[in-house]
């Protein structure tokens, strides 16, 4: 049964990318032809908050001020933030980055590559990675995201 097969696959993906698991890398060609990978940012000795988002997604746009607050508060203390634009047109992503005043790095034009790898079915989906590349927490939003980042940055 294809539906059961799909559900089993989804469970396996979620197990592989659960809290405590090592990050799964991916590489995306950027509009300028360069290639960028998650591993260019994750497992570099810092906590990294990764926001999987799209320009057309209202809740994604609403989360940006919360991410900006964390970036402003903790970036100088060693927190990195990375945006990964999924399911979106390059020009729409670039326009949204300007409109929203996003200053942290972005992997754009990722489409469904990372969402399939991480079993992400809805966005925004925000994952906090530890300095060693393990997943600290998945699907962080609003106050829960702020609390989790504050907790790890105290250590």
Q: Which residue ranges define each predicted feature?
A:
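N-proximal helix/coil linker or "cap" segments that precede and/or mark the start of modular domains
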Residues: 1-31, 36-45, 95-98
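Short loop/turn microsegments at loop-to-beta-strand junctions
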Residues: 23-24, 48, 123-124
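Thiol/disulfide oxidoreductase modules built on the thioredoxin-like
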Residues: 96-102, 109-153
């Amino acid at each position: 049964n294809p539906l059961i097969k799909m559900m089993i696959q989804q469970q396996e993906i979620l197990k592989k990318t659960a809290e405590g698991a090592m990050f799964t890398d991916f590489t995306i060609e950027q509009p300028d032809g360069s290639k960028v990978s998650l591993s260019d940012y994750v497992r570099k000795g810092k906590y990294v908050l990764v926001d999987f988002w799209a320009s057309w997604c209202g809740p994604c746009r609403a989360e940006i001020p919360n991410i900006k607050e964390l970036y402003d508060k903790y970036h100088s203390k060693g927190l990195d933030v990375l945006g990964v634009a999924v399911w979106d047109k390059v020009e729409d992503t670039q326009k949204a980055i300007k409109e929203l005043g996003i200053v942290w790095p972005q992997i754009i034009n990722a489409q469904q590559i990372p969402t399939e790898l991480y079993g992400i079915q809805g966005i925004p989906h925000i994952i906090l990675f530890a300095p060693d590349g393990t997943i600290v927490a998945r699907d962080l939003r609003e106050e829960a995201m702020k609390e989790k980042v504050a907790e790890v940055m105290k250590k």
